[in-house]
């Protein structure tokens, strides 16, 4: 759609009035302090409370607007639990509509995963006891309300869930939450002239906004000591995939993916992050000045002016977070460990191969829309399966109750950033996965596998999986 003559004149006037304002969005120089979500740690016998409610939040440090979230703020606190603990979690719904919740990446039985069988009505609670029996990982909790997942997550029903174990606590890597270990929940939104979020789902595909937010802030910065900084990245956007790099070219050292640590750190110049994916990276801030983690290209001046008059899905600014080193370099600095854990060893044979085709203009998986009364896949706990997933329209794909290794992408090698055990992957044409089922589910409480373009999931690109407990 082209600008009318009147709109062009108005836009030109705005540009002239901007004076010394930069014409293109800069990739450095954060403006707002990074909000760090409060940390809730599970203690033996002490429940974790997560109350869903309305709140008020400013996305730009100015006017506050109505949002959703947990415990009185936008988004939710970071929950930290420990392997081998049994965590009592109390979800309280103080909103005016039903919500279901899940913890993506947490390896628990289907009856504890949430979803359609665990709807939380207004002014009601759900109190599962979660047995944490997995290695350290960065997971996330979020709404997965049937047919309402996209607006519920967009409104603010999401937060990070960290699993720690003896290995994660002993590794020589940053682990001081909010000091050298930062959670980054990345979203894109469309804001009105008063800074209030707008949401108009498209008829096909997924929603994309023009404003990049991190922990609910635009263009944030954080001051860090000179040395290694750990960033726990979560893409909580409805549909947008990001390609990340540092503004000054320094490498991102990838140490963990969805389901935990890689065998060894990987130095990458750039990496992608699809909706639902989590990655942990280390950045060396011992040398040089401030540097900004960026996400692709920013809008040009004409694209930004056009956005004044019509909705845009081109990001005004690509800045995720600016790191500002302060102080002197310590006399003794930690070196990056050469190894993080042992190599992955597959202790079983592939039991069968399955193929899945994700819907594009028409939702569904293998041509079938989600039906809560239908089981689409039946398997057994302890099995490995080969899954070939195809998508003509690029989109992320997530599996509950399982973990997988990406074996190939479009018939070629797996991108380095997709190494290690995962539960979410970007599908652009074909990916081959080696899937391991470690938890059991039932027809009453099945696991889901689905498109993580949330609007696609809401339209029916979800299917159900039952993993029967092994007889051994």
Curated annotation (Swiss-Prot):
Molecular function (GO) terms for this protein are: copper ion binding; oxidoreductase activity
Q: Keywords of this protein's UniProt record, alphabetized?
A: Cell cycle, Cell division, Periplasm, Signal
Disulfide-linked positions: none
Keyword set includes Cell cycle:
yes
Presence of keyword Signal: yes
SUPFAM superfamilies linked to this entry: Cupredoxins
* Signal sequence coordinates: 1-27
Major place of residence: periplasm
Which biological process terms from the Gene Ontology are attached to this UniProt entry? Answer: FtsZ-dependent cytokinesis
Modifications after synthesis and translation: Predicted to be exported by the Tat system. The position of the signal peptide cleavage has not been experimentally proven.
Q: Where in the cell is it found?
A: Periplasm
- Domain of life of the organism in this record? Bacteria
Cellular component terms (Gene Ontology): cell division site; outer membrane-bounded periplasmic space
Job description of the protein: Cell division protein that is required for growth during stress conditions. May be involved in protecting or stabilizing the divisomal assembly under conditions of stress.
User: What NCBIfam families does this protein's entry cite?
Assistant: PRK10883.1 (NF008135)
- Please state which protein family the record places this protein in: Belongs to the FtsP family.
Q: What name appears for this protein in its UniProt entry? A: Cell division protein FtsP
Its lineage reads: Bacteria, Pseudomonadati, Pseudomonadota, Gammaproteobacteria, Enterobacterales
